[in-house]
């Protein structure tokens, strides 16, 4: 249940906001208005980075923030997972478009060093991250 108490609404799905159906988006718009939501969080794939502003405009005057499921800043590891984010994409590149990231850890062959490095980079470049 959305109360609007904090004025922040985090839309959690395991896909991209741009892939939500029209009925769901209309429902979110209605909740934003009715509950006086001033800040919305959505997840979106990096491939949608050039569509974020247009999508966010739909929910004005609320501020819309996006997080990206980048999984890791290790380019070779990320590439091996075939998530569609190129090896040359840096944390700074992602931060140009996204306010937060979702990191994946404890996969086969993972290391404490890699996880801690990803966390350090997330702290440096983003206002939000989840592991």
Name each model feature, range by range.
Residues 21-25, 52-53, 112-116:
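Conserved strand-to-helix beginnings and helix N-cap segments that scaffold or border functional pockets
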Residues 30-31, 55, 117-122:
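A generic secondary-structure signal
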């Amino acid at each position: 249940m959305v109360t609007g108490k904090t004025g922040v609404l985090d839309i959690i799905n395991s896909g991209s906001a741009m892939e939500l159906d029209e009925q769901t988006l209309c429902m979110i718009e209605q909740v934003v208005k009715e509950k006086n939501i001033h800040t919305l969080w959505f997840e979106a794939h990096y491939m949608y980075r050039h569509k974020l502003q247009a999508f966010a405009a739909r929910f004005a005057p609320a501020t819309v923030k996006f997080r990206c499921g980048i999984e890791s800043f290790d380019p070779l590891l990320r590439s091996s997972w075939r998530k569609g984010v190129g090896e040359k994409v840096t944390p700074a590149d992602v931060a140009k478009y996204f306010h937060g990231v979702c990191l994946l850890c404890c996969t086969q062959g993972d290391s404490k060093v890699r996880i801690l490095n990803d966390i350090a980079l997330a702290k440096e470049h983003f206002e939000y991250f989840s592991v």
